[in-house]
């Protein structure tokens, strides 16, 4: 069975505001199965933003695990992320999951990978998924050369990614924390 895959998730931080958004396309091989999927969520009583890319079932499994780690560690984003990455790296079942998470709270943005990496972007811009590089490049240019809000930067960057990446569409969901 082919995996569901392909998406673009982007987070932009400017000042005390962070925005995280994603497109809505879900593909199975070369077929678009859905165009309005919700791959971005607010969790932990609306204090943490999460976006996911990769296999749909795998991403939901990781999202569930991440939420339980947040609860266990009282919302401490770095600690919950590191603990999830440890489990992901060492648990036989979790090691097979093919997905990535992009998470953010008021202070920190992190990318969590299946290799056990927990990465904090230097410039407050994080991106994952097949269109992530396009969106990240656009966001960097917009952040450095405009006064747009993080939400507007995410929206414009996802649009650019959707015009370039066949696995990314123009249906966006964007969440913010301020």
From Swiss-Prot:
Q: Which top EC class applies here?
A: hydrolase
PROSITE patterns to which the protein is assigned, alphabetical: PROTEASOME_BETA_2
Which UniProt keyword terms apply here?
Allosteric enzyme, Cytoplasm, Hydrolase, Metal-binding, Protease, Sodium, Threonine protease
Which GO CC annotations does the UniProt entry carry?
A: HslUV protease complex; proteasome core complex
Q: What is its main location?
A: cytoplasm
User: What does the activity regulation annotation say?
Assistant: Allosterically activated by HslU binding.
Q: Name one GO molecular function term.
A: metal ion binding
Tell me the active site: 7
Which Enzyme Commission number(s) are on file for it? 3.4.25.2
Which Pfam families does its entry note?
Proteasome
Looking at the keywords, is Plastid present?
Answer: no
Q: Which family does it belong to?
A: Belongs to the peptidase T1B family. HslV subfamily.
Complex formation: A double ring-shaped homohexamer of HslV is capped on each side by a ring-shaped HslU homohexamer. The assembly of the HslU/HslV complex is dependent on binding of ATP.
Q: What does this protein do?
A: Protease subunit of a proteasome-like degradation complex believed to be a general protein degrading machinery.
The protein's name:
ATP-dependent protease subunit HslV
